[in-house]
Amino acid sequence: MRLPSILVVAASTLFLHYGYTSASPGADAVLTGAVSLGFLQLVGADQSVIEQPRFLRDGKIAEGDNEERVNAQKEAAAKVLDQVFKTKSLSPLDKLEKTSNLAVIRHVAAMVDDKVDKIFAFADAVGMGRASMLKMLKGDKQFTDAERLKTVKRYVKFLIKKEQNNKA
């Protein structure tokens, strides 16, 4: 709550308190609450906005933990991944080889896993089995045999995981 709204509540409560018909213990409680909120607002007025997440986590912050930095890392990872899918090339990933920021690489890996799971879910929805997946990948010359097998193994793991989730 902001201080001006607290002051308005306190002033209106004081106004009601002095009326003959509306004076009640409830008005006293509202006045006490408004004044205490106003006092807390004034006491905490020197606290900066940056300290709010720290307050919510009880002051327990890991070294180097910064919310803005995490958001920037996620945005950088999303940008690289979008470039990969728009250009249909892995050349934007070359930027990641040069970076020493492990968090960005982890975010990219997590986003790639999510994207691949969505693609596998679509393939499963249209009834594609692992043999069909392998046949489709053999038709594409930009994959090596090792990449084809790795993709099919990952697809099989996805199908097994999906079956286990359906049984549970």
UniProtKB/Swiss-Prot annotation:
Induction: Expression is induced during host plant infection.
Places the protein is found: Secreted; Host cell
Domain of life the protein comes from: Eukaryota
Location of the motif RxLR-dEER: 54-69
Protein name according to UniProt: RxLR effector protein CRE8
Segments traversing the membrane: none
Keywords for the protein's UniProt record, in alphabetical order: Secreted, Signal, Virulence
Record's comment describing the protein's domains: The RxLR-dEER motif acts to carry the protein into the host cell cytoplasm through binding to cell surface phosphatidylinositol-3-phosphate.
One GO CC term, this protein: extracellular region
Function: Effector that is involved in host plant infection. Contributes to virulence during the early infection stage, by inhibiting plant defense responses induced by both PAMP-triggered immunity (PTI) and effector-triggered immunity (ETI).
Coiled-coil positions: none
Signal sequence segment: 1-23
Family the entry assigns: Belongs to the RxLR effector family.
